[in-house]
Regions:
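Beta-strand-rich domains and repeat architectures in extracellular enzymes and scaffolds
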Residues: 40-72, 87-88, 92-99, 247-249
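Secretory targeting signatures
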Residues: 1-29, 264-310
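Beta-rich, blade/repeat-based domains predominating
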Residues: 47-58, 91-101, 131-144, 148, ...
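A short helix->beta-strand "capping" segment at the edge of beta-propeller domains
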Residues: 28-48, 80-82
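Short loop/turn segments that connect beta-strands within beta-propeller blades
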Residues: 77-81, 119-123, 159-162, 204-208, ...
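Conserved beta-strand positions in repeat-built beta-propeller and related beta-rich domains
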Residues: 62-68, 105-112, 147-152, 192-196, ...
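Blade-loop segments of beta-propeller domains
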Residues: 81-117, 125-135
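Blade-level signature of beta-propeller repeat domains, shared across WD40, Kelch, NHL, RCC1
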Residues: 233-268
Length: 310
């Protein structure tokens, strides 16, 4: 009976340890890490823009600006911030996000359910696409056009037909993330702004999970005079490996490098402490097993009176 009870206790404790270890492993996988960043370069803009999209190509920044009656597409010099050329969009359209596709730019519109394909060489519209719902942000991952519509869903579209191939839901620590806005594709990673929030998310393009995030509040706090002048616009710079970011009606564009945040060490220390506790408890269990085995070997065998004859 004593041996059976000891075995049961050991099994229960071992099972508890396995659940604890599994929980810690799941926690380390699912939780989005906060990363830090540093500003390595700043470019003043010649004119402010109600920024909706941002792209870098061949030493220039391409920037789309929204608002009815004020929408446009600009090419901006990456050294001076001066406007090289500008294309005015029809007053009936509210321009949204942009992305480079081959030698053209795909531009979304907000509520008009229309996307334009614009020739980069002369800023002329060469093709139109229709889609259902609102258009917010867009990027090209080398295979699909990835598009947001202000919800927690993003769609992956055929670059030739603009038809939806599949959609995924964006989740942050298991919760859906609404208001996904400007997008930037870098390999299998998607960088995204959230409308009205000072945060940039890194999203896994397969699962939709947020992998890490940065909070550029230190930059946005120096920009804008009203609630609409929010962080919006992300462009990957292949030459530096950094990201250009800006916002609506901002006076500057910033090149940032993303790095690990010092505060993550606290999370790592906590997880390390949890692992140490698990190992310590497991060691105690092993010691109890050894002591129990040693005691059983040295105790005299108890006769089985039930089976003996009188």
């Amino acid at each position: 009976m004593r041996r059976r009870l000891g075995t049961s206790i050991v099994c229960i404790l071992a099972f508890s340890i396995s659940l604890s270890v599994e929980s810690m492993a799941s926690e380390s996988t699912d939780e989005a890490e906060e990363k830090g960043f540093k500003v390595v370069r700043t470019i003043p803009l010649e004119e402010t823009s109600f920024t909706q999209g941002l792209e870098v190509m061949d030493g220039s920044i391409f920037q789309s600006s929204g608002l009815y009656g004020g929408s446009n597409l600009r090419e901006i010099d990456l050294q001076s911030g001066n406007i090289i050329r500008e294309m005015t969009i029809n007053d009936s359209y509210f321009a949204e996000g942009i992305t480079v596709l081959d030698q053209s730019i795909i531009m979304l519109t907000w509520k008009e359910e229309r996307a334009f394909r614009i020739d980069i060489s002369n800023f002329s519209i060469i093709e139109n696409f229709s889609f259902e719902g609102e258009g917010w942000g867009i990027c090209f991952n080398g295979e699909h056009l990835v598009m947001s519509n202000g919800t927690s869903q993003i769609s992956f579209r055929d670059p030739e037909t603009f038809e939806i191939n599949h959609t995924i839901q964006i989740t942050w620590d298991g919760q859906p993330v609404p208001n996904i806005n400007e997008l930037e594709c870098v390999g299998m990673e998607i960088l995204a702004n959230i409308w009205l929030q000072d945060v940039i998310l890194s999203i896994d393009s397969i699962s939709g999970n947020v992998q890490y995030f940065i909070s550029p509040a230190s930059i946005s706090s120096t920009q804008g005079t009203n609630s609409n002048d929010v962080l919006n616009g992300i462009a990957f710079d292949k030459s530096s490996g950094g990201f250009w970011i800006t916002g609506k009606n901002w006076t500057h564009i910033y090149l940032i490098e993303i790095s690990h945040q010092d505060t993550t060490s606290e999370i790592q220390e906590t997880r390390g402490s949890n692992w140490f506790s698990a190992i310590f408890i497991l060691s105690i269990i092993m010691l109890l097993i050894l002591l129990s085995t040693f005691r059983n070997k040295n105790e005299p065998e108890t006769p089985n009176f039930k089976g003996s004859t009188p």
